[in-house]
Design a protein with these regions (language model features):
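Short, Lys/Arg-enriched N-terminal segments with co-localized hydrophobic residues
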Residues: 4, 11-23
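N-terminal strand-loop-strand beta-hairpin
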Residues: 23-131, 172-189
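Residues forming well-ordered secondary-structure scaffolds
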Residues: 105, 122, 143, 160-167
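A short, polar/proline- and glycine-enriched secondary-structure boundary/capping micro-motif
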Residues: 89-94, 146-147, 157-159
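Conserved, surface-exposed functional patches that form binding/active-site neighborhoods
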Residues: 116-154
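Short acidic, Gly/Pro-enriched loop/turn segments at secondary-structure junctions
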Residues: 37-39, 155-159
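Mixed-charge, glycine-accented linear interaction segment located at domain edges/termini
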Residues: 157-180
């Protein structure tokens, strides 16, 4: 577990420090949350610790391959391109992150060049246990959702992370049949 977290941190430090493109992978499971408080209590009983709450503004741009978004929050901004592969409610994502020093200018440029597909604003409470993060998301105009995310070290088989996430979902009392496999903005389309 420590090895996975160290690998993830190393990739993020390279991205933050040098502005280079960093390819990463994760396994995700997203689900509606009728009772975020109960899920948070169960997660904390499993050893998850709250690391903070963020206000995030995501602008999705029109692209022909995958999804491209500019994520802005108080401590920084990132351009994120990702491609998802769905399997039984779990999503394997291949993604690239580039830190952005001038998000307003980039958002204006990308909006003019590509067009805006959607905007999503959310308040995200982040809980973490080893290499697995639990997001409790209050999404404007969409509701409350949870998302489990496990970052994969290079070369690791995603099957082990899917197994871990499935066990956590069961402990949180989230049925696999409730998993959703779309971005928040796609829920109303």
């Amino acid at each position: 577990l420590a090895r996975r977290e160290a690998a993830r941190q190393q990739r993020l430090e390279v991205a933050r420090g040098h502005g280079r493109r960093v390819a990463m992978r994760n396994v995700e499971a997203k689900f509606p949350l009728p009772d975020a408080g109960a899920v948070r209590q169960r997660a904390e009983a499993l050893g998850f610790e709250c690391t903070g709450t963020l206000i995030q503004h995501d602008t999705f741009f029109v692209v022909s391959n995958g999804k491209l978004k500019l994520r802005e929050q108080r401590d920084g901004a990132w351009l994120i391109h990702y491609r998802r592969h769905h399997e039984k409610g779990f999503e394997l994502s291949d993604y690239d992150i580039v830190p952005v020093s001038e998000p307003l200018k980039l958002r204006q440029l990308m909006s003019a060049a590509l067009g805006v597909l959607a905007r999503v604003r959310k308040r995200r409470t982040l809980l973490q246990r080893a290499h697995i993060r639990l997001h409790l998301d209050h999404v404007d105009n969409h509701g409350v959702f949870g998302e489990l995310e496990a970052v994969l070290p290079e070369g690791e088989d995603p099957a082990s992370c899917r197994t871990e996430i499935a066990a956590i979902l069961a402990a949180l009392q989230i049925p696999v049949g409730q998993l959703i496999d779309v971005s928040y903005f796609e829920l109303t389309r």
